[in-house]
Design a protein with these regions (language model features):
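A glycine-rich beta-to-alpha transition motif near the start of alpha/beta enzyme domains, typified by
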Residues: 43, 50-52, 75-103
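Conserved acidic
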Residues: 57, 61, 83, 87, ...
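Hydrophobic/aromatic pocket-lining and membrane-interface residues
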Residues: 65, 69, 78, 95, ...
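Ribokinase/PfkB-type carbohydrate-kinase core domain
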Residues: 1-30, 54, 89-106, 111, ...
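A general structural signal for well-ordered alpha-helical segments in protein cores
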Residues: 62-66, 88, 165
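Glycine-rich phosphate/adenosyl-contacting loop at the front of the ribokinase-like
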Residues: 1-77
Length: 250
């Protein structure tokens, strides 16, 4: 079986179940987006949603994918950076409990923390304090992390750090890994569109997007977006919620 390495923001997720969109509107959070906030802000927002049903676990986009693969008995590992605190320990323990090899470094900031607001239609809206996750840098990317793996799964949120993502892609290519990229959030796609298209064309083998991200990436509806995405990489996937996924191989 193929071995998969993940890299992304090492975050602890607090999942908050909402009954409707009212709280998102009150907090001025665009539904389906990811908004970066300070540590003080995320503490304040979490305090304001005390009455909602919540659960906590190790998270982050790429880490969640790696957890899913580990649950299917795929050999996996994850690269990230956490703080020297309880949340960092929770994140590392969560990886080990699923037999995921933790390639984790420790930063100076507090561990990253995300509030994931889930509405009844299963749409997720994030407010994220990146903390130590933001300190991951090209010098942290040791060749030994990549050795022996067949695929690298990268989260699109790393688009916000161009030098880091460029180094990741080059390191993966050097070690002959296939590269899988999940676009992560439509607003991140919009803010980095030009460089993103170049990276997909030059490095990415498998590209994932939901309907909003595919629209932001191509300006087209899912079926047409899939065709355009497939012209840039080997396999394109557009996730369409309850409708499953559209897949096209080049």
């Amino acid at each position: 079986m193929k071995k998969v390495l993940g890299i992304g923001n090492a975050l602890v997720d607090t999942l908050v179940k909402l009954e409707d969109d009212a709280f998102l509107e009150e907090m001025k959070l665009p539904k389906g987006s990811m908004q970066l906030v300070s540590q003080d802000d995320i503490v304040d927002i979490e305090r304001k949603c005390e009455g909602f049903e919540k659960s906590m676990s190790g998270g982050g986009s790429a880490a969640n994918t790696i957890h899913g693969l580990a649950g299917l008995d795929v050999e996996t590992a994850f690269i990230g950076k956490v703080g020297k605190d309880e949340l960092g320990d929770l994140f590392a323990d969560d990886l080990r409990a699923k037999n995921i090899r933790p390639f984790l470094m420790q930063g100076e900031s507090h561990s990253g923390h995300a509030l994931a607001f889930v509405t009844p239609d299963s749409e997720r809206t994030f407010t994220t304090y990146l903390g130590a996750a933001l300190e991951l840098n090209p010098e942290d990317l040791q060749d030994r992390f990549f050795e022996g793996f067949d695929y690298l799964h990268v989260e699109g949120y790393l688009l916000q750090n161009h030098s880091l993502l460029q180094a990741i892609l080059e390191k993966a290519r050097k070690n002959r890994l296939k590269i899988s990229l999940d676009l992560a959030s439509f607003n991140v796609v919009e803010e980095n569109l030009h460089v993103l298209k170049n990276w997909v064309r030059d490095y990415v083998d498998i590209l994932f997007a939901n309907e909003e991200e595919a629209k932001a990436f191509t300006g087209k509806d899912p079926e047409q977006a899939l065709e355009e995405m497939a012209r840039l990489c080997e396999i394109a996937v557009v996730k369409v919620g309850k409708g499953g996924s559209l897949v096209r191989a080049a």
